[in-house]
Amino acid sequence: MAQYAMYAYCFFAILSLVNTVCGSLGVAVNIPSILLTIKQWVLMLAPIALWGTFRLIQPRNEKLLRRCCEVMVFYYVFSFVLSICFKFNLIPMTQNGLITRTATILTWTVNSIGLLSVIASLIAGCHLGRKHKGSMHQLGTALILVFIVWLICVNILPTTMFYLLGISHPTAFTCVNMFSAFSNTLVYIYAYYRMYRTINN
């Protein structure tokens, strides 16, 4: 299952990257809406399969690593369920043109859990890099890279670019968007590839 999850994630992550880059450059790409929906779901379900499988192969004495995996699985499951609820109007996003209080609370909750998942990924990466060798050590390095890229793309780069060029400067927005898309796609593909190799070993 981990193999298929990794391949599916790679395919749809690259598709998402192409869509983002073309959108930033103003190039029209006609991707069917059903494919975009499948892409969104796969990018959440594949990490659940990979992190869940990785959690199952950990011995009982790896309590810290097991807890980190559980945080990651919970985040992706919660995000997936919430996206389903919003997509099929099980939870209304807006009412009378305004975002509902429930939607605001749930969005804030998933963002908070997302931050915890990034920290959990970093802790898992540091633990693997310090305690293990071979494929587990390489996975640890990949997870640390995920945190570094997240820190640069979400916090450092946007602030720096907008401070230097101005928030309304179209070049700044395009550069940040494309750099984030490329770096996030590559680092996550590498991390999940390393996780797949670790699971197979």
Predicted regions and their residues:
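Membrane-proximal first intracellular loop
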Residues: M1-L36, I48, G52-L56, H127-G140
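Membrane-interfacial loop-to-transmembrane alpha-helix junctions, especially the N-terminal start
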Residues: M1-Y9, N61-V71, G134-I144, N200-N201
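Hydrophobic alpha-helical transmembrane segments of multi-pass membrane proteins
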Residues: A2-S24, M72-L82, L143-F162
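Alpha-helical transmembrane segments of polytopic membrane proteins
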Residues: L15-N19, S33-P47, A103-V118, A172-T185
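Interfacial non-cytosolic loop connecting adjacent transmembrane helices
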Residues: G23-L35, N89-W108, I156-S180
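Internal transmembrane alpha-helix with an interfacial aromatic "cap," most often the third helix
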Residues: Q40-F74, S83-K87, I119-G129, I189-I199
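Hydrophobic, aromatic-enriched interface-forming segments
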Residues: E70-C126
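C-terminal transmembrane-bundle signature of multipass membrane proteins
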Residues: V118-N201
